[in-house]
Amino acid sequence: MRILVNGGGPAGMAFAMFAARSGRGDEITVRDWTGPGDTYGFGVILPPAAVEVFRDAEPDLADELNSHITAWDRLSVHRHGRTASIPAPRLGAMDRRTLLKVLRRRCAERGVRFEHGAVDPALGDHDLVVAADGARSVTRRHRAAAFGTTTREIGPAYIWLGADRALEHLRFLVAETPDGPAVAHAYPYSPDRSTFLVEADGAPPPAVLAEWFAGPLGGARLLENRSRWSRFQEIHNRTWSAGNVVLIGDAAHTAHYSIGSGTRLALDDARALADALCAQPRLADALKGYEDARRPIVEHTQRIGRLSATWFTRLPDVPMERLLDDLATRGGQISWRDLATEGSGAVPVRG
């Protein structure tokens, strides 16, 4: 089977590695518009279950990824000059560039080919085309009617930034501004870096944001990397495959960033698709099996993400202890069990 993977992010790289290891693909090519090391973003959240996706197939890879992860088991809120924290399910993050470097090396060791340049929406003569080219997928957009793609904006305006300091753990920082509260979602991903995502009205420049959050930043600088203000696009597709083209990761679905599930969903998709191709000799059956396995989990995660986004849009001004409780359950709409399950790739069983 000749396989083309459009997109060299976590979903595309992980799928190529799994497919090459299984021997299902005689020739696997990853095509990406960026070159090696030329990536965007800062740290990505990897709950323990995301790393365990690799454990049985690549135990040394799981160990290598764990060695790069900065972990925490608390979350805190800072508002009105006060900080309070509570224990939280164990989570961690790592540099997105490091994750891709590790996965790319594993792909190369298994004979995966790499091409760089604009993603070509044409199918060519490949037996399978895997659309792993992100939320703005060119591959999907050229077949939007076949996939039944719909999008909707959820949550407030936001911008992805970094900080040149490792914060202690997952922190939610609230700054009072003339346009209302601005909220930073911040977490460490290396010994000297943190992701620093800010939600605010009016699209203020990073220099203004640095002033608003000067206290919690403690002298750290805010960093930009293709950073721009936008609204989150929740993506749905009626079907995840059309002919020999299949969607994975953000090309197939997105869940709001406030629950930190995007990379885990991408890695789980990659493993599930590779497993389905091994289990079913007919391509159509394999693609159906992949979607049947993943869609319930994805739709559950998207629902949790919508509840979370709505809560942040209506951030309550309540005493600190109440705010912590509200944050942990997004105003009583979800539970710690929901959030812990977000890291396990499973849909909770409701009693």
Curated annotation (Swiss-Prot):
One of its GO terms (molecular function) is NAD+ binding. Its EC number is 1.14.13.223. The keyword Transmembrane does not apply. It comes from the Bacteria. One of its GO terms (biological process) is antibiotic biosynthetic process. It is an enzyme of class 1 (oxidoreductase). SUPFAM superfamilies: FAD/NAD(P)-binding domain. Keywords: Antibiotic biosynthesis, FAD, Flavoprotein, Monooxygenase, NAD, Oxidoreductase. It catalyses: 3-hydroxy-4-methylanthranilyl-[aryl-carrier protein] + NADH + O2 + H(+) = 3,5-dihydroxy-4-methylanthranilyl-[aryl-carrier protein] + NAD(+) + H2O. The keyword NAD applies. Its cofactor is FAD. Pathway: Antibiotic biosynthesis. It holds the Pfam family FAD_binding_3. Belongs to the aromatic-ring hydroxylase family. Involved in the biosynthesis of the antitumor antibiotic sibiromycin. Hydroxylates the C5 position of the peptidyl carrier protein (PCP)-bound 4-methyl-3-hydroxyanthranilic acid (4-MHA or 3H4MAA), leading to the formation of the fully substituted anthranilate moiety found in sibiromycin. This is 3-hydroxy-4-methyl-anthranilyl-[aryl-carrier protein] 5-monooxygenase.
